[in-house]
Amino acid sequence: AHGIKDAGSMHLFWQAARLLLRENSAPIRSMGRISVRPRTYQLVPLLMALRLDPVRLLIADDVGVGKTIEAALIARELWDRGEIRRLAVLCPPYLCDQWAKELSEKFHFQPVVVNSATVGLLEREVPHERSVYSHFPVQVLSIDFVKRERNKYLFLQHAPELVIVDEVHGATPAGGRERHLRYELVRALADDPRRHLLLLTATPHSGVPQAFQRLLGLLDREFESWDPSTWTEEQRIRLARHFVQRTRKDIAATWEGAPLFPEREVRYEGYHLSPEYRALYEAAFRYAREVVRRSEGLAEVRRRMRWWAALTLLRSVMSSPRSAQSALERRGVPLEEEEALLELA
Protein backbone atom coordinates (compact mmCIF):
# COMPACT_ATOMS: atom_id res chain seq x y z
CA ALA A 1 0.00 0.00 0.00
CA HIS A 2 3.07 2.29 0.14
CA GLY A 3 2.65 3.42 -3.48
CA ILE A 4 -1.11 4.17 -3.27
CA LYS A 5 -1.64 7.92 -3.55
CA ASP A 6 -5.00 8.34 -5.28
CA ALA A 7 -8.35 6.67 -5.85
CA GLY A 8 -7.24 5.14 -9.16
CA SER A 9 -4.27 3.41 -7.56
CA MET A 10 -6.49 2.18 -4.74
CA HIS A 11 -8.93 0.69 -7.24
CA LEU A 12 -6.13 -1.13 -9.06
CA PHE A 13 -4.78 -2.45 -5.75
CA TRP A 14 -8.22 -3.73 -4.76
CA GLN A 15 -8.74 -5.42 -8.13
CA ALA A 16 -5.32 -7.09 -7.89
CA ALA A 17 -6.04 -8.36 -4.38
CA ARG A 18 -9.46 -9.65 -5.43
CA LEU A 19 -8.02 -11.51 -8.43
CA LEU A 20 -5.23 -12.96 -6.32
CA LEU A 21 -7.69 -14.29 -3.75
CA ARG A 22 -9.92 -15.69 -6.48
CA GLU A 23 -6.93 -17.37 -8.12
CA ASN A 24 -5.78 -19.06 -4.91
CA SER A 25 -9.24 -20.41 -4.23
CA ALA A 26 -9.96 -21.51 -7.79
CA PRO A 27 -9.72 -25.19 -8.76
CA ILE A 28 -7.14 -24.30 -11.44
CA ARG A 29 -4.55 -22.01 -9.90
CA SER A 30 -2.22 -21.56 -12.86
CA MET A 31 -4.52 -19.42 -15.02
CA GLY A 32 -3.18 -16.19 -13.52
CA ARG A 33 0.40 -17.06 -14.43
CA ILE A 34 0.15 -17.94 -18.10
CA SER A 35 0.26 -15.69 -21.14
CA VAL A 36 -1.89 -17.82 -23.40
CA ARG A 37 -5.62 -18.46 -23.50
CA PRO A 38 -6.07 -22.24 -23.73
CA ARG A 39 -8.80 -23.65 -25.91
CA THR A 40 -11.45 -25.55 -24.00
CA TYR A 41 -10.33 -28.91 -25.36
CA GLN A 42 -6.75 -28.18 -24.23
CA LEU A 43 -7.92 -28.28 -20.61
CA VAL A 44 -8.91 -31.95 -20.87
CA PRO A 45 -5.40 -33.36 -20.22
CA LEU A 46 -5.05 -30.97 -17.27
CA LEU A 47 -8.31 -32.17 -15.73
CA MET A 48 -7.20 -35.77 -16.28
CA ALA A 49 -3.85 -35.03 -14.63
CA LEU A 50 -5.49 -33.57 -11.53
CA ARG A 51 -7.14 -36.95 -10.91
CA LEU A 52 -3.84 -38.85 -10.96
CA ASP A 53 -1.09 -39.21 -8.38
CA PRO A 54 1.48 -39.48 -9.70
CA VAL A 55 0.54 -37.93 -13.02
CA ARG A 56 1.23 -40.41 -15.82
CA LEU A 57 -0.25 -39.31 -19.15
CA LEU A 58 0.27 -40.21 -22.79
CA ILE A 59 -0.94 -37.20 -24.81
CA ALA A 60 -1.28 -38.37 -28.41
CA ASP A 61 -3.28 -35.53 -29.95
CA ASP A 62 -2.88 -34.79 -33.64
CA VAL A 63 -0.23 -32.43 -34.99
CA GLY A 64 -1.33 -28.82 -34.45
CA VAL A 65 -3.80 -29.55 -31.66
CA GLY A 66 -1.45 -28.16 -29.01
CA LYS A 67 0.34 -30.89 -27.08
CA THR A 68 3.02 -28.43 -25.96
CA ILE A 69 0.44 -26.12 -24.39
CA GLU A 70 -1.42 -29.05 -22.83
CA ALA A 71 1.75 -30.42 -21.20
CA ALA A 72 3.00 -27.01 -20.09
CA LEU A 73 -0.39 -26.25 -18.51
CA ILE A 74 -0.04 -29.38 -16.37
CA ALA A 75 3.51 -28.40 -15.42
CA ARG A 76 2.45 -24.87 -14.46
CA GLU A 77 -0.47 -26.16 -12.39
CA LEU A 78 1.63 -28.70 -10.49
CA TRP A 79 4.22 -25.98 -9.85
CA ASP A 80 1.68 -23.47 -8.56
CA ARG A 81 0.14 -26.10 -6.28
CA GLY A 82 3.56 -26.74 -4.77
CA GLU A 83 3.62 -30.38 -5.92
CA ILE A 84 6.82 -29.92 -7.93
CA ARG A 85 9.77 -27.59 -7.65
CA ARG A 86 11.80 -28.90 -10.57
CA LEU A 87 10.91 -29.73 -14.17
CA ALA A 88 12.69 -31.27 -17.16
CA VAL A 89 11.67 -31.53 -20.81
CA LEU A 90 13.39 -34.24 -22.87
CA CYS A 91 13.04 -33.63 -26.59
CA PRO A 92 14.91 -34.01 -29.89
CA PRO A 93 17.75 -31.48 -30.29
CA TYR A 94 15.92 -29.44 -32.92
CA LEU A 95 13.01 -28.76 -30.53
CA CYS A 96 15.01 -27.55 -27.52
CA ASP A 97 14.93 -23.84 -28.34
CA GLN A 98 11.25 -23.97 -29.27
CA TRP A 99 10.35 -25.60 -25.95
CA ALA A 100 12.44 -23.09 -24.00
CA LYS A 101 10.72 -20.20 -25.78
CA GLU A 102 7.23 -21.59 -25.09
CA LEU A 103 7.94 -22.20 -21.40
CA SER A 104 9.46 -18.75 -20.97
CA GLU A 105 7.06 -16.57 -22.95
CA LYS A 106 3.75 -18.32 -22.28
CA PHE A 107 4.15 -20.04 -18.91
CA HIS A 108 6.56 -17.79 -16.96
CA PHE A 109 9.21 -20.43 -16.36
CA GLN A 110 12.92 -19.65 -16.62
CA PRO A 111 14.33 -22.66 -18.47
CA VAL A 112 17.87 -23.42 -19.54
CA VAL A 113 18.70 -25.52 -22.60
CA VAL A 114 21.09 -28.39 -21.88
CA ASN A 115 22.87 -29.90 -24.86
CA SER A 116 26.40 -30.42 -26.12
CA ALA A 117 26.66 -26.77 -27.19
CA THR A 118 25.47 -25.21 -23.92
CA VAL A 119 26.58 -27.53 -21.13
CA GLY A 120 30.07 -26.01 -20.91
CA LEU A 121 28.70 -22.50 -20.35
CA LEU A 122 26.11 -23.73 -17.85
CA GLU A 123 28.73 -25.58 -15.81
CA ARG A 124 30.50 -22.26 -15.17
CA GLU A 125 27.41 -21.02 -13.32
CA VAL A 126 27.14 -24.10 -11.10
CA PRO A 127 28.78 -24.34 -7.64
CA HIS A 128 31.47 -26.99 -7.35
CA GLU A 129 29.40 -29.27 -5.13
CA ARG A 130 26.47 -29.38 -7.59
CA SER A 131 25.82 -30.47 -11.18
CA VAL A 132 23.99 -28.83 -14.05
CA TYR A 133 21.13 -31.30 -13.56
CA SER A 134 20.60 -30.42 -9.89
CA HIS A 135 21.28 -26.67 -10.03
CA PHE A 136 18.75 -25.39 -12.57
CA PRO A 137 15.11 -25.97 -11.59
CA VAL A 138 13.68 -25.87 -15.13
CA GLN A 139 15.62 -27.57 -17.90
CA VAL A 140 15.03 -28.37 -21.56
CA LEU A 141 17.38 -31.19 -22.48
CA SER A 142 18.38 -32.82 -25.74
CA ILE A 143 17.41 -36.46 -25.24
CA ASP A 144 20.27 -37.52 -27.50
CA PHE A 145 22.73 -35.67 -25.27
CA VAL A 146 21.35 -37.07 -22.02
CA LYS A 147 21.09 -40.66 -23.26
CA ARG A 148 24.88 -40.90 -23.57
CA GLU A 149 26.40 -43.09 -20.89
CA ARG A 150 28.49 -40.31 -19.33
CA ASN A 151 25.46 -38.03 -18.92
CA LYS A 152 22.66 -40.49 -18.29
CA TYR A 153 23.45 -41.62 -14.75
CA LEU A 154 24.18 -38.13 -13.46
CA PHE A 155 20.87 -36.91 -14.87
CA LEU A 156 18.97 -39.86 -13.39
CA GLN A 157 20.58 -39.18 -10.02
CA HIS A 158 19.16 -35.64 -10.00
CA ALA A 159 16.06 -36.07 -12.20
CA PRO A 160 13.20 -33.75 -11.18
CA GLU A 161 9.71 -34.57 -9.95
CA LEU A 162 8.14 -33.96 -13.38
CA VAL A 163 9.60 -35.03 -16.71
CA ILE A 164 7.98 -34.27 -20.08
CA VAL A 165 9.15 -36.43 -22.99
CA ASP A 166 8.31 -34.97 -26.40
CA GLU A 167 8.27 -37.08 -29.58
CA VAL A 168 8.29 -40.14 -27.34
CA HIS A 169 7.67 -42.48 -30.31
CA GLY A 170 11.39 -41.99 -30.98
CA ALA A 171 12.12 -43.57 -27.60
CA THR A 172 10.58 -46.99 -28.24
CA PRO A 173 12.93 -49.99 -28.39
CA ALA A 174 11.91 -50.97 -31.94
CA GLY A 175 14.04 -49.25 -34.56
CA GLY A 176 17.73 -49.56 -33.77
CA ARG A 177 20.35 -48.76 -31.18
CA GLU A 178 19.65 -45.02 -30.85
CA ARG A 179 15.97 -45.58 -30.09
CA HIS A 180 16.85 -48.31 -27.62
CA LEU A 181 19.18 -45.95 -25.73
CA ARG A 182 16.42 -43.34 -25.52
CA TYR A 183 13.99 -45.98 -24.31
CA GLU A 184 16.37 -47.13 -21.57
CA LEU A 185 16.63 -43.53 -20.34
CA VAL A 186 12.86 -42.97 -20.24
CA ARG A 187 12.30 -46.42 -18.75
CA ALA A 188 14.67 -45.59 -15.90
CA LEU A 189 12.76 -42.35 -15.26
CA ALA A 190 9.43 -44.19 -15.27
CA ASP A 191 10.71 -46.76 -12.77
CA ASP A 192 10.48 -44.16 -9.98
CA PRO A 193 6.86 -44.65 -8.82
CA ARG A 194 6.70 -41.10 -7.41
CA ARG A 195 7.70 -39.32 -10.62
CA HIS A 196 5.18 -37.41 -12.71
CA LEU A 197 5.64 -38.30 -16.39
CA LEU A 198 4.06 -36.75 -19.49
CA LEU A 199 4.63 -38.51 -22.81
CA LEU A 200 3.86 -36.57 -26.00
CA THR A 201 3.55 -37.93 -29.54
CA ALA A 202 1.28 -37.59 -32.55
CA THR A 203 2.09 -41.17 -33.63
CA PRO A 204 1.79 -43.49 -30.62
CA HIS A 205 1.40 -46.62 -32.75
CA SER A 206 3.93 -47.27 -35.50
CA GLY A 207 2.35 -50.55 -36.58
CA VAL A 208 4.54 -52.61 -34.25
CA PRO A 209 2.32 -53.90 -31.41
CA GLN A 210 5.27 -54.68 -29.12
CA ALA A 211 6.61 -51.12 -29.42
CA PHE A 212 3.16 -49.72 -28.58
CA GLN A 213 2.92 -51.98 -25.52
CA ARG A 214 6.38 -50.84 -24.35
CA LEU A 215 5.22 -47.24 -24.72
CA LEU A 216 2.13 -47.89 -22.61
CA GLY A 217 4.34 -49.70 -20.11
CA LEU A 218 6.02 -46.38 -19.34
CA LEU A 219 2.71 -45.26 -17.82
CA ASP A 220 2.21 -48.43 -15.80
CA ARG A 221 4.29 -51.62 -15.92
CA GLU A 222 1.11 -53.68 -16.04
CA PHE A 223 -0.01 -52.04 -19.31
CA GLU A 224 3.00 -53.55 -21.08
CA SER A 225 1.63 -57.08 -20.64
CA TRP A 226 -1.78 -56.22 -22.08
CA ASP A 227 -2.39 -57.36 -25.67
CA PRO A 228 -4.27 -54.54 -27.48
CA SER A 229 -6.17 -57.09 -29.58
CA THR A 230 -7.72 -58.64 -26.46
CA TRP A 231 -8.27 -55.63 -24.18
CA THR A 232 -11.22 -56.07 -21.86
CA GLU A 233 -13.65 -53.25 -21.14
CA GLU A 234 -12.15 -52.88 -17.67
CA GLN A 235 -8.65 -52.55 -19.16
CA ARG A 236 -9.85 -49.94 -21.67
CA ILE A 237 -11.43 -47.88 -18.90
CA ARG A 238 -8.30 -48.07 -16.80
CA LEU A 239 -6.04 -47.12 -19.71
CA ALA A 240 -8.35 -44.23 -20.67
CA ARG A 241 -7.42 -42.51 -17.39
CA HIS A 242 -3.85 -42.18 -18.70
CA PHE A 243 -4.26 -41.86 -22.49
CA VAL A 244 -5.80 -39.02 -24.51
CA GLN A 245 -5.84 -38.94 -28.31
CA ARG A 246 -7.85 -36.52 -30.47
CA THR A 247 -7.55 -35.71 -34.16
CA ARG A 248 -8.09 -32.24 -35.60
CA LYS A 249 -11.28 -33.57 -37.19
CA ASP A 250 -12.57 -34.84 -33.83
CA ILE A 251 -11.98 -31.50 -32.16
CA ALA A 252 -13.35 -29.40 -35.01
CA ALA A 253 -16.57 -31.42 -34.97
CA THR A 254 -17.23 -31.53 -31.23
CA TRP A 255 -15.73 -28.46 -29.51
CA GLU A 256 -16.81 -24.85 -29.13
CA GLY A 257 -19.30 -24.83 -32.02
CA ALA A 258 -17.05 -22.85 -34.37
CA PRO A 259 -14.23 -23.80 -36.75
CA LEU A 260 -11.00 -24.15 -34.76
CA PHE A 261 -8.65 -24.79 -37.66
CA PRO A 262 -8.48 -23.11 -41.06
CA GLU A 263 -9.82 -25.11 -43.96
CA ARG A 264 -7.07 -26.50 -46.14
CA GLU A 265 -7.36 -25.51 -49.77
CA VAL A 266 -5.24 -27.50 -52.22
CA ARG A 267 -4.32 -25.89 -55.51
CA TYR A 268 -1.68 -26.97 -57.97
CA GLU A 269 0.39 -24.37 -59.78
CA GLY A 270 2.75 -25.08 -62.65
CA TYR A 271 6.34 -23.92 -62.43
CA HIS A 272 8.53 -23.61 -65.53
CA LEU A 273 12.21 -24.26 -65.02
CA SER A 274 14.66 -21.91 -66.64
CA PRO A 275 17.20 -23.59 -68.95
CA GLU A 276 19.92 -23.17 -66.30
CA TYR A 277 17.73 -24.56 -63.52
CA ARG A 278 16.67 -27.51 -65.68
CA ALA A 279 20.32 -28.28 -66.45
CA LEU A 280 21.09 -28.19 -62.73
CA TYR A 281 18.22 -30.56 -61.94
CA GLU A 282 19.20 -33.01 -64.66
CA ALA A 283 22.80 -33.03 -63.43
CA ALA A 284 21.62 -33.61 -59.85
CA PHE A 285 19.33 -36.40 -61.04
CA ARG A 286 22.20 -38.13 -62.84
CA TYR A 287 24.33 -37.83 -59.72
CA ALA A 288 21.56 -39.22 -57.48
CA ARG A 289 21.02 -42.13 -59.84
CA GLU A 290 24.75 -42.90 -59.70
CA VAL A 291 24.66 -42.82 -55.88
CA VAL A 292 21.84 -45.38 -55.90
CA ARG A 293 23.62 -47.55 -58.48
CA ARG A 294 26.80 -47.58 -56.40
CA SER A 295 24.85 -48.69 -53.34
CA GLU A 296 24.16 -52.10 -54.87
CA GLY A 297 25.95 -54.80 -52.94
CA LEU A 298 26.17 -52.78 -49.72
CA ALA A 299 24.55 -53.82 -46.46
CA GLU A 300 20.83 -53.06 -46.22
CA VAL A 301 21.23 -50.19 -43.74
CA ARG A 302 23.97 -48.45 -45.75
CA ARG A 303 21.99 -48.91 -48.98
CA ARG A 304 18.94 -47.24 -47.45
CA MET A 305 21.10 -44.42 -46.13
CA ARG A 306 22.34 -43.70 -49.65
CA TRP A 307 18.84 -43.83 -51.10
CA TRP A 308 17.69 -41.27 -48.54
CA ALA A 309 20.71 -39.10 -49.27
CA ALA A 310 19.87 -39.15 -52.99
CA LEU A 311 16.20 -38.33 -52.39
CA THR A 312 17.09 -35.51 -49.99
CA LEU A 313 19.41 -33.99 -52.57
CA LEU A 314 16.73 -34.07 -55.28
CA ARG A 315 14.09 -32.55 -53.00
CA SER A 316 16.47 -29.75 -52.06
CA VAL A 317 17.37 -29.01 -55.67
CA MET A 318 13.68 -28.83 -56.63
CA SER A 319 12.77 -26.70 -53.60
CA SER A 320 14.62 -23.50 -54.47
CA PRO A 321 17.97 -22.28 -55.83
CA ARG A 322 19.16 -21.40 -52.31
CA SER A 323 18.19 -24.84 -51.03
CA ALA A 324 19.98 -26.39 -54.00
CA GLN A 325 23.14 -24.41 -53.23
CA SER A 326 23.09 -25.52 -49.59
CA ALA A 327 22.54 -29.17 -50.52
CA LEU A 328 25.29 -29.16 -53.13
CA GLU A 329 27.75 -27.56 -50.71
CA ARG A 330 27.08 -30.41 -48.31
CA ARG A 331 28.03 -32.86 -51.02
CA GLY A 332 31.61 -32.08 -50.05
CA VAL A 333 31.04 -34.42 -47.10
CA PRO A 334 32.06 -38.00 -48.02
CA LEU A 335 29.14 -40.41 -48.26
CA GLU A 336 30.53 -42.57 -45.47
CA GLU A 337 30.70 -39.56 -43.13
CA GLU A 338 27.20 -38.49 -44.16
CA GLU A 339 25.87 -41.96 -43.35
CA ALA A 340 27.34 -41.68 -39.86
CA LEU A 341 25.62 -38.31 -39.40
CA LEU A 342 22.31 -39.75 -40.57
CA GLU A 343 22.59 -42.57 -38.07
CA LEU A 344 22.99 -40.01 -35.28
CA ALA A 345 20.00 -37.96 -36.45
What are these regions (language model features)?
Residues I59, V65-K67, A71, A75, ...:
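Extended, hydrophobic alpha-helical segments in both membrane/secreted and soluble proteins
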Residues H128-E129, H135, Q139-P160, T172-R195, ...:
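Inter-lobe coupling linker of SF2 helicases/translocases
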Residues L57-A60, A88, L198-L199:
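Short hydrophobic/aromatic beta-strand immediately N-terminal to the Walker A/P-loop
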Residues G3-L47, P54, K67-A72, R76-L189, ...:
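SF2 helicase/translocase NTPase motor core
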Residues G64, D166, T201:
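Conserved G/P- and acidic residue-centered "switch" motifs that form tight phosphate/ATP-binding loops
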Residues L50-R51, F285:
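Short, locally clustered residues in the helix-turn-helix/winged-helix DNA-binding domain
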Residues D62, P92, T203:
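P-loop (Walker A) phosphate-binding loop of NTP-binding proteins
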